[in-house]
Curated annotation (Swiss-Prot):
This is Phosphoglycerate kinase. Pathway: Carbohydrate degradation; glycolysis; pyruvate from D-glyceraldehyde 3-phosphate: step 2/5. It comes from the Bacteria. Pfam families: PGK. GO terms for biological process: gluconeogenesis; glycolytic process. Keywords: ATP-binding, Cytoplasm, Glycolysis, Kinase, Nucleotide-binding, Transferase. InterPro entries: Phosphoglycerate_kinase (IPR001576), Phosphoglycerate_kinase_N (IPR015824), Phosphoglycerate_kinase_sf (IPR036043). Belongs to the phosphoglycerate kinase family.
Length: 393
């Protein structure tokens, strides 16, 4: 990675404004999954061990520039205190007198968490006044929030332009895993793209077709491709306006010598529910009033065998409606294939990360990305503003 990292900074006695991604799921004020907090620990622990005064900033949810009591970061501060084994101070303001006072009292190795940065309308607008307030709090800037790296906000890009700015350990790990995969892949290189809609994955599919040996398609978006092949798909998800594009992608794959792999059978249901009647049918035999909600058993075997023969696999998007157990089998089969492959497995955040967590397979993967939108944009070949704003080595 050609950006400065925390290893390039002298942090002892310095105030370090550290953008983290603590956007964790909450239920009744309790954190239900602390993965993102744990992911930031290596950076926080290195900074505190080296005697920095660590000022942590994060968003939580979408308060849209106003104070939403349920989205305060107090539960996060409590959980972080437990994980670090030391007190984490927390302010009720994002900036202002209370924050200035807390920072002035912070000791070397101390940790302070400021309030949810999205309580300020200026955060998402990258407002110069808020940027100035953040910059005045600190001597150095560290971005460890890969999950927010695709946002050009005050705490991700604005302040990075005002202070010496470096990547944290998680940011570095994410960029190296995804960057090496896309720039210098071991082959055979397989990408699996799932999810509901073609329109959300157009740029990803287009960019990956220039890089991969196998492109496996699953999830709702597969049925627009099946339709483009001339098959009837019943009531399955269809984007009429993307049929021509689907044909273009299949032609591009042919020209590039990419093995473009679509489902050969599907689990169809007579209703979108857990209680629906279901059956497995070949892909060209979907009944007119049924819809396909998961890949079938032959498809699972086919996809699994391609994964097992690959040296590198990137996966983004589920194979079916995995939130309903009746239609989770395809996603689970792919997750199990990735867990058991000898090749390097990368899970591209979002629903795929949620799926491998659900099936208890996250530990078996080589890299599970913490950023859904950010990893998607990185896979599209886009420049991430939060990364671009950091100092070059």
């Amino acid at each position: 990675m050609n950006k400065k990292t925390i290893n390039d900074l002298q942090v002892e006695g310095k105030r370090v404004f550290t953008r983290v991604d603590f956007n964790v799921p909450l239920k009744d004020g309790e954190i239900t999954d602390d993965t993102r907090i744990r992911a930031a620990l290596p950076t926080i622990e290195q900074l505190t061990a080296q005697g920095a005064k660590v000022i942590l900033a994060s968003h939580l949810g979408r308060p849209k520039g106003t104070v939403v009591e349920e989205l305060r970061l107090d539960p996060v501060a409590d959980r972080l205190s437990d994980l670090l084994g030391k007190e984490v101070l927390k302010t009720d303001q994002v900036y202002g007198e209370e924050v200035d006072q807390a920072i002035s009292e912070l000791e070397n190795g101390g940790v302070l968490l400021i309030e949810n940065v999205r309580f300020e309308a200026g955060e998402e607008k990258n407002d110069p006044e808020l940027v100035e307030a953040f910059a005045n709090m600190a001597d150095l800037y560290v971005n460890d929030a890969f999950g927010a790296a695709h946002r050009a906000h005050a705490s991700t890009t604005g302040v990075a332009e005002k202070l010496p700015a470096a990547a944290g350990k998680l940011m570095e790990k994410e960029i190296e895993a995804l960057g090496n995969a896309l720039e210098n892949p071991e082959r055979p290189f397989t990408a699996i793209v799932g999810g509901a809609k073609v329109k959300d994955k157009i740029s990803v599919i287009d960019n990956l077709l220039d890089k991969v040996d196998n492109l496996i398609i699953g999830g709702g978006l597969a049925y627009t491709f099946i339709k483009a092949q001339g098959h009837e798909i019943g009531k399955s998800l269809l984007e009429e306006d993307k049929i021509d594009l689907a044909k273009e992608f299949m032609n591009k794959a042919k020209e590039k010598g990419v093995n473009f792999v679509l489902p050969v059978d599907a689990i169809v249901a007579d209703d979108f529910s857990e209680e629906a009647n279901t059956k497995i049918v070949d892909i060209d035999k979907i009944p007119s009033d049924w819809e396909a909600l998961d890949i079938g058993t032959k498809t699972r075997e086919k996809y699994s065998s391609i994964v097992k023969d690959s040296k590198l696999v990137i996966w983004n998007g589920p194979m079916g409606v995995f939130e309903l157990n009746a239609f989770a089998g395809g996603t689970k089969a792919v997750a199990e294939a990735l867990a058991s492959t000898e090749g390097y497995s990368i899970i591209g955040g979002g629903d795929s990360a949620a799926a491998v967590e659900k099936f208890g397979l996250a530990e078996e993967m080589d890299h599970v990305s913490t950023g859904g939108g950010a990893s998607l944009e990185f896979m599209e070949g886009k420049v991430l503003p939060g990364l671009a704003a950091l100092n070059d080595k």
